[in-house]
């Protein structure tokens, strides 16, 4: 960027602000090293940091510079590069400012609140002289929100003020000039449009002092797309908690690339009808509280124009601001490697204008409240056809958002859909060296290949992940959203006993997986026939936990929430009969009901099942046999093997008991190394069991299969498979149905690589899903974190006090910054936004939640007792008289039942996968384009 001027003060040419200008490829700042994994950014060659410089655009000099202000033609480009010296208007690069100038180069009686001076050796707005690059701290951000405040010890206020009329006497909505560099980056063909060019030259700020339900046109609130009479077809929502600027940029840049894919459609009969395609798409960012927000993320948003420092208001005449709403239409984007992308031509790689709504909530009130702002506040005004939900950090792949939308366009009864989420594996898949990442990668892949297609075939996908899903807005209106928002604690006083304060601990856990509640309510909506689907063409990439503590904490919420929500859907299945689904769909819903019941039962008894499987295999292989089938104990002989197996059993039990102790008394982050040791011990035991299982398979097939599996008649075949005459049939069926299906389905899905690099890790760690993750989850059933957290940052913000204007109008006095100051402050903002990212782990406060422990204890006792009872009943000699069978016979029968049941459930998943694959292929040929 550069100042466009005549070359000096009073040059006779008027100021028109900054112009986007690229770095000279031979300058000292052009050799920027990209973080690993970003070297192949498809638009990096067009970024601010990698192109040659262009000439000043003297034609566009305006008429806004006061004669007393110097007009400079120096380049700001170098100052945007990391480690660049500070520059201020009216001075050369690296020169010290006048003692009578503040950090923006504007004369005043005191230094501004922007942190360090230009001669301090680090950039404006705060910086670390040791690191040499800018960063944003909480204190510096708070200071920048009070640009008109006098410093300690006195001084004069800097800016003049203007009077802004409140809408209906209570709603504060103000337009602010954007920095000249942002305005000039918009392609002229959009800026020159009459009637709508204001969206490119001014950012709109609204201080919402109401509940999301009261954010209505009747109460004086409005949004730009509706003000311009635009139809919103697609509302893309990004929910944010505390992610860093790299994660947010990854999502934001991916969304803008996907919007470009939609705008570039040449043969579309829909998107190109009735106006430009970009006017039918709105991107909404909802940030869950100022306190948790990474302030460097706000610098990134300010760099592309959808946020400005110094405009937010703590309250409007005593009415507390609940949400700060910014609106702007931009063509700028920042990549995850902190490169600024701007339009250069009308080519297919140029980003189109994107309509942004940025909602910065004043307090942290959870994701479900963010969705209430999205659906009840913005959704009711914009009335979109489809809403796509993304979490900050999820990167949609090319044309993924288009793929989700096409699913709704081609199926009028589709109420919700989700795409394929896969783990981010790093450059060259290097993250797969971490066993936890590999296990989660396999889990995601199998879910996308077997589970989601099966549920899609039924018509009810039990969970559309909030990180990457979509809903038809009119489908979720009414009861689905009403039930969904019962979990919002900000409605607790209004809802009374129906709200979160009136819920028992079971229902509170259910709302930990609130997306499952919305899915069930949508399918069971009275009188309607909405169904849910999985769309293979839509893919999203997300980070997964890489440490044991983070992994356990994440799964605690997932497991408890999904367990409670699954029970909720089973108990309320009768509401399906009030829906409008046809008899065929209802038949498949009943099949899915039975399938889900079986899954819940197996999940409940999984702790005992894993223990029994481990001990049975050890006894079958390790104990010596006498008589006709005499054999020695393997692998260490008759004496050592039984003793070795007994020690392993005691270690197994000891570490299971240890998990209960850890879960009841410690947080995962406080016992990190103990949990890592537990993962290692269980994986070693599982590896030993896999070796013994392989030995069993070899022994079973030493007798020719033809002698064990008879095919003379159907009865003989069934007896040889399901009878007790031989083991080969059972083992063969188990191998094919459990493990063979994984390979077959993965190859048919044309995505088999996880079977080679992730499946071995999963085989080693699969017991930890029960012995560690589920034990921790059930022991922390009481841990439900609700409540609004106050914000010190919010308290430090300025207020908007109303006065009476002409004709008794209610007005607010607001500062009126000169364009030069806006542009100068923008320089520091961009420098902070494009600085290299340092990933520093932030310490978290201890969680002292101690309620609902009695319920938790009863649940754990019931679960542990029932599993122990099953294990004892199967293996103990004391039950021989009751069952008239020896414990070995009962053990063999249980083991056989377990294998057949697991194989049966796997076959059901495979059949659903085949149906989905066939339907997708057929629909691909006949779908409307």
Swiss-Prot record:
It is a multi-pass membrane protein. It comes from the Eukaryota. Keywords: Cell membrane, Cell wall biogenesis/degradation, Glycoprotein, Glycosyltransferase, Membrane, Transferase, Transmembrane, Transmembrane helix, Virulence. The chain crosses the membrane at residues 587-607, 643-663, 678-698, 730-750, 758-778, 857-877, 897-917. Residues 1-12 have a biased composition (Gly residues). Its EC number is 2.4.1.16. InterPro entries: Chitin_synth, Chitin_synth_fun, Chitin_synth_N, Nucleotide-diphossugar_trans. It is an enzyme of class 2 (transferase). CDD domains: Chitin_synth_C. Belongs to the chitin synthase family. Class III subfamily. Polymerizes chitin, a structural polymer of the cell wall and septum, by transferring the sugar moiety of UDP-GlcNAc to the non-reducing end of the growing chitin polymer. CHS1 and CHS3 have compensatory functions in cell wall modifications in responses to stresses. Involved in appressoria formation and required for full virulence. This is Chitin synthase 1. It comes from Pyricularia oryzae (strain 70-15 / ATCC MYA-4617 / FGSC 8958) (Rice blast fungus). The gene is CHS1.
């Amino acid at each position: 960027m550069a100042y466009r001027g005549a070359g000096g003060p009073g040059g006779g040419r008027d100021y028109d602000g900054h112009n986007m200008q690229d770095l000279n490829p031979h300058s000292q700042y052009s050799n920027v090293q990209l973080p690993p994994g970003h070297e192949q950014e498809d638009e990096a060659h067009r970024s601010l940091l990698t192109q040659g410089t262009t000439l000043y655009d003297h034609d566009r000099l305006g008429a806004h510079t006061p004669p007393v202000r110097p007009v400079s033609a120096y380049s700001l480009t170098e100052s945007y590069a990391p480690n660049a010296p500070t520059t201020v208007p009216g001075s050369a690069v690296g020169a010290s400012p006048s003692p009578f100038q503040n950090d923006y180069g504007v004369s005043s009686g005191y230094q501004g609140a922007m942190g360090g001076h230009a001669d301090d050796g680090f950039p404006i707005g705060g910086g670390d002289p040791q690191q040499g690059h800018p960063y944003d701290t909480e204190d510096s951000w708070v200071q920048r929100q009070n640009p008109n405040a006098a410093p300690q010890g006195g001084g004069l206020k800097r800016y003049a003020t203007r009077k802004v009329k409140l809408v209906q006497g209570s709603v504060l909505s103000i337009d602010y000039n954007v920095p000249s560099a942002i305005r000039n980056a918009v392609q002229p063909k959009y800026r020159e449009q009459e009637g709508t060019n204001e969206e490119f030259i001014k950012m709109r700020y609204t201080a919402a002092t109401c509940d999301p339900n009261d954010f209505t046109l009747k109460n004086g609130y409005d949004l730009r797309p509706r003000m311009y009479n635009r139809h919103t077809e697609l509302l893309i929502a990004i929910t944010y908690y505390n992610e860093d600027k790299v994660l947010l940029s990854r999502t934001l840049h991916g969304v803008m690339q996907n919007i470009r894919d939609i705008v570039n459609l040449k043969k579309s009969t829909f998107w190109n009808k009735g106006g430009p395609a970009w006017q039918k798409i709105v991107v909404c960012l909802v940030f869950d509280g100022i306190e948790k927000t990474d302030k460097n993320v706000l610098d990134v948003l300010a760099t592309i124009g959808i946020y400005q420092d110094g405009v937010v208001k703590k309250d409007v005449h005593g009415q507390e601001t609940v949400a700060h709403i910014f609106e702007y239409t931009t063509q700028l984007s920042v990549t995850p490697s902190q490169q600024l992308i701007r339009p250069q031509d009308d080519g297919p790689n140029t980003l189109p204008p994107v309509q942004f709504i940025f909602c910065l909530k004043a307090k942290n009130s959870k994701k479900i409240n963010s969705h209430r702002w999205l659906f009840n506040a913005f959704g009711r005004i914009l009335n979109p056809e489809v809403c796509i939900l993304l979490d900050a950090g999820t990167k949609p792949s090319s044309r993924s958002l288009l793929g989700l939308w096409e699913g709704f366009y081609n199926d009028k009864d589709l109420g919700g859909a989700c795409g394929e989420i896969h783990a981010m594996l790093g450059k060259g898949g290097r993250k797969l060296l971490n066993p936890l990442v590999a296990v989660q990668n396999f889990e995601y892949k199998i879910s996308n290949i077997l589970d989601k297609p099966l549920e899609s075939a039924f018509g009810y996908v039990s969970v559309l992940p909030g990180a990457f899903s979509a809903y038809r807005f009119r489908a979720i209106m009414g009861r689905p959203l009403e039930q969904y928002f019962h979990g919002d604690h900000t409605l607790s006083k209004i809802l009374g006993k129906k709200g979160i304060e009136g819920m028992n601990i079971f229902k509170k856990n259910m709302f930990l997986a609130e997306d499952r509640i919305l899915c069930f309510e949508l399918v069971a909506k009275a009188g309607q026939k909405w169904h849910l689907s999985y769309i293979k063409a839509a893919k999203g990439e997300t980070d997964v936990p890489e440490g044991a503590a983070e992994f356990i904490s994440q799964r605690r919420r997932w497991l408890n929430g999904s367990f409670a929500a699954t029970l909720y859907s089973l108990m309320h299945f009768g509401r399906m009969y009030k829906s409008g689904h046809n008899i065929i769909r209802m038949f498949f819903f009943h099949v899915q009901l039975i399938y889900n019941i079986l899954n819940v039962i197996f999940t409940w008894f999984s702790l005992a099942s894993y223990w029994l499987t481990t001990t049975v295999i050890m006894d079958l292989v390790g104990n010596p046999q006498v008589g006709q089938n005499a054999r020695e104990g393997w692998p260490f002989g008759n004496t050592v093997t039984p003793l070795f197996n007994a020690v392993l059993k005691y270690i197994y039990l000891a570490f299971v008991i240890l998990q209960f102790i850890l879960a009841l008394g410690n947080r995962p982050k406080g016992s990190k190394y103990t949990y890592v040791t537990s993962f290692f011990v269980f994986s070693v035991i599982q590896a030993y069991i896999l070796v013994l299982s392989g030995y069993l398979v070899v022994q079973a097939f030493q007798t020719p299969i033809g002698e064990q599996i008879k095919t003379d008649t159907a009865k003989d075949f069934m007896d040889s498979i399901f009878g007790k005459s031989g083991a080969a049939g059972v083992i063969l069926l188990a191998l094919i149905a459990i493990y063979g299906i994984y390979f077959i389905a993965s190859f048919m899905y044309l995505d088999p690589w996880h079977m080679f690099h992730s499946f071995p890790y999963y085989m080693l760690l699969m017991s930890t899903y029960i012995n560690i993750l589920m034990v921790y989850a059930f022991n922390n059933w009481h841990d439900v974190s609700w409540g609004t957290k106050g914000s010190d940052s919010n308290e430090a913000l300025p207020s908007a006090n109303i006065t009476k204007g002409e004709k008794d109008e209610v007005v607010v006095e607001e500062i009126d910054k000169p364009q030069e100051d806006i542009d100068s402050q923008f320089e520091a903002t961009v420098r902070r936004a494009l600085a290299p990212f340092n990933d520093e782990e932030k310490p978290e406060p201890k969680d002292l939640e101690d309620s609902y422990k009695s319920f938790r204890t009863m649940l754990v006792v019931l679960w542990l007792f029932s599993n122990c009872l099953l294990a004892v009943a199967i293996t103990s000699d004391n039950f021989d008289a009751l069952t008239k069978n020896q414990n070995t016979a009962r053990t063999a029968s249980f083991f056989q039942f377990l294998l057949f049941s697991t194989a049966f459930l796997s076959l059901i998943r495979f059949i659903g996968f085949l149906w989905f694959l066939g339907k997708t292929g057929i629909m691909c040929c006949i779908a409307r384009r």
